[in-house]
Amino acid sequence: RRWCFRVCYRGFCYRKCR
């Protein structure tokens, strides 16, 4: 199963899937 979530760091957001 793949989980995708949004990661925000220092004003920069990206999508992370594991």
Swiss-Prot record:
Species whose genome carries this gene: Limulus polyphemus (Atlantic horseshoe crab)
GO cellular component: extracellular region
The organism's place on the tree of life at top rank: Eukaryota
Name this polypeptide is given: Polyphemusin-1
Protein role: Significantly inhibits the growth of Gram-negative and Gram-positive bacteria.
Statement: the UniProt record of this protein carries the keyword Secreted: yes
Positions carrying Arginine amide: 18
GO biological process: defense response to bacterium
UniProt record similarity statement: Belongs to the tachyplesin/polyphemusin family.
Keywords: Amidation, Antibiotic, Antimicrobial, Disulfide bond, Secreted
